[in-house]
A protein has these predicted regions:
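Short amphipathic alpha-helix that is part of the acyltransferase structural core
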Residues: 25, 35-76, 88, 100-101, ...
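Intrinsically disordered, low-complexity segments enriched in polar/charged residues with Gly/Pro
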Residues: 79-82, 223
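A short helix-loop-beta-strand connector motif used in the catalytic cores of GNAT acetyltransferases and
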Residues: 81-93, 207-211
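Hydrophobic, Leu/Ile/Phe/Ala-enriched alpha-helical segments that form helix-helix packing faces
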Residues: 59-63, 81-84, 176-181
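Short secondary-structure boundary micro-motifs
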Residues: 76-80, 144
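Active-site/acyl-donor-binding loops of N-acyltransferases
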Residues: 4-40, 104-238
Length: 238
């Protein structure tokens, strides 16, 4: 059960119900308020059917050390893309370098299933909003959500990259950010384990990072070890 870090009431309730907090996950969110320059070194296009095998190999290799990850086959990954509402292969992108796929990720519009908003805006966000309100008079600034305002965002899903080429993933993130702006979204976000190398790449785009706690309850035996932990973004919504 993921619980937002500031939600003390829920954490207290689940603690009383016998659940234990065993892991943190982070949700970095890039504010898509201005377009990024992209590198001509890479070819970035939607994935095509004949590339699925290579994409699956990259995803499986990238996530091989993460608990909770189940490797894909080409067939199960195609089914996965089709079965998640408002996802699909047309929203899955691959980065090619010298005809080799070196990074990939999908964009999922989960807003068709659920909306995110602050029922009570954190104090830090209120402070940032005041500061950015002044700065907005002289330059473009990231949008800060108001209390009760629905967040317009896209989830980054099923990402992976050749760890020898993190700049390929950065190029893809910039491309997805530009697409998000064209689609009039305010944020591009995902959910990751703190040890995920993807987080280090995403930090180069200066995201807002929030923390969620994973609470679990064992009905038999010891609590599971979730270190490092594969985060399926569908679990944050569905």
């Amino acid at each position: 059960m993921p619980i937002y870090e500031s939600n003390r009431a829920s954490k207290s309730l689940f603690g009383k119900l016998g659940y234990s907090r065993i892991r943190e996950i982070k949700t970095p969110a890039i504010s898509t308020y201005k377009k990024s320059d992209t590198s001509p070194e890479y070819s970035i296009k939607p994935v095509i059917k004949k590339e699925i095998v290579d994409v699956v190999g990259l995803i499986n290799e990238y996530n091989s050390g993460f608990i909770h990850f189940l490797p894909f086959t080409a067939q199960t990954f195609e089914t996965h893309l089709k079965s998640v509402p408002w996802y699909g292969s047309e929203n899955f992108w691959a980065v090619r370098n010298e005809n080799k796929i070196v990074a990939c990720a999908g964009l999922w519009d989960s807003s068709k299933l659920a909306n995110l908003y602050y029922a009570r805006e954190p104090a830090a966000m209120k402070m940032m909003k005041s500061i950015f309100g002044v700065l907005s008079l002289i330059t473009k600034v990231p949008k800060i959500m108001a209390e009760g305002e629905r967040l317009k965002f896209l989830y980054i899903a099923d990402y992976a990259f050749d760890k020898r080429q993190p700049e390929a993933m950065l190029a893809l993130l910039k491309h997805l950010s530009n697409l998000s702006i064209d689609m009039k979204q305010d944020y591009l976000m995902t959910a990751t384990d703190p040890e995920d190398d993807f987080l280090a790449v995403m930090k180069k785009l200066k995201p807002q990072i929030e923390i969620w706690s994973i609470f679990v309850k064992s009905f038999e035996g010891d609590l599971p070890t979730l270190n490092p932990f594969y985060v399926d973004v569908r679990d944050m919504i569905l």
